[in-house]
Amino acid sequence: MRLRAGFEIARPAAVVWDELCADDALHWCRILNDVRWTSPRPFGVGTTREVKALAGANLLREYYFRWEEGHRHSFYVKETTSPLFKALAEDYLVEPRGEDACRFTWTIAVELTAIGKPGKPVNRALLKTLFTDTARHYGLTPA
């Protein structure tokens, strides 16, 4: 399952990038309860992060395999407590659109386990709330 959303944001790319890398990154996403970097700054390839989701029911340990400072980073989940996901990866791309605007493209790719496949529509809906919440955070109309 692959989901992608693009957001045209009326903020400089550097501001959006800093938010995505902040200590409280993604605090606006309802299904994420705690996002904690487990690597020291400055971040780069090899950075790790832990995320608690769904009221702490799911813990994800993420490993960043791509880091292009100020522009793009990508990670895969190296460990999760959820029996529903066989693999999960995300890519964040921030592209300037002039001095005071940017485009943020967020891609999520998930491979469900045999147990998770019957719940694909529910999993898709839950993951899409990340996009809806992000649109609201940036003052955009959710798609």
Residue ranges and their predicted role:
Residues V16-L20, A25, R49, Y64, ...:
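Hydrophobic pocket/interface hotspot
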Residues I9, T81, V110-A114:
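Beta-strand elements of well-folded, non-transmembrane domains
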Residues M1-R41:
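Hydrophobic ligand-binding cavity/cleft-lining segments
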Residues R103, I108-A143:
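A conserved amphipathic terminal alpha-helix motif
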Residues W28-I31, L54-A101, A109, L140:
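Hydrophobic-ligand binding "helix-grip"
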Residues L3-I9, Y92, W106-I108:
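A structural signal for short, well-ordered beta-strand segments
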Residues P42-T47:
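A short, glycine/Asx- and small/polar-enriched loop/turn
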